[in-house]
Amino acid sequence: MPVLQILAHTPLWVWALFAFLVYRGVAAMGGREVSPYRVLIVPAVFFVWGASSLLERSDGSALNVAAFLGALLVGAAAGGVLASLTPAPRLSPATGLLAMPGSPVALVLNCVAFAAKYAGNVALALTSGAAAHAELASVVVAIGGLFAGLFWGRTLRQFQRALQADGRTATVAALAALVVGRRTSREA
């Protein structure tokens, strides 16, 4: 199938998602203050996209579920390491916002993740034969898990570093309080 036909048959929501991811990546290049829950948007998008691939392609396959979960864990670990290599965000006590340092990392990750998912789904659409389709479906599901984990691991590590820079322990309660915009009773 020619490339132009593939592009023409791509649903509009896919291009809207790509535009959104590029927009968010470009916005992340400049330092900015954002509410913690807004930082969760892109990881949530990739988790939903990855989980939908799992649901669409699993056919009850334990292999696909294992591929998704295994890749999710590997991605989360890699995302945590990646977040450790960049400057830590700072928490503004007055506003409760996160001061995110500018970086091209989000734009690059968004584009690479989109390209990998897009290419995998195009390859699936073009694959004939049940065995080849099942094998490729496992790869596409794993890619979805890998990038969902990468974004979640990076985000959670950024939250942890912001709390630590603010002199707080990064407990589950402190992370939840950060996202909803209030301090836990032990921190007040």
What role is predicted for each listed range?
Residues 19-34, 80-93, 154-161:
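C-terminal ends of transmembrane helices
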Residues 4-18, 65-74:
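Structural signature of hydrophobic alpha-helical transmembrane segments
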Residues 40-60:
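A generic, lipid-embedded transmembrane alpha helix
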Residues 33-46, 64-71, 95-99:
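Cytoplasmic-side transmembrane-helix entry/capping segments in multi-pass membrane proteins
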Residues 1-6, 24-34, 71-72:
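Short juxtamembrane and helix-loop transition motifs at transmembrane-helix boundaries
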Residues 108-188:
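C-terminal membrane-adjacent module
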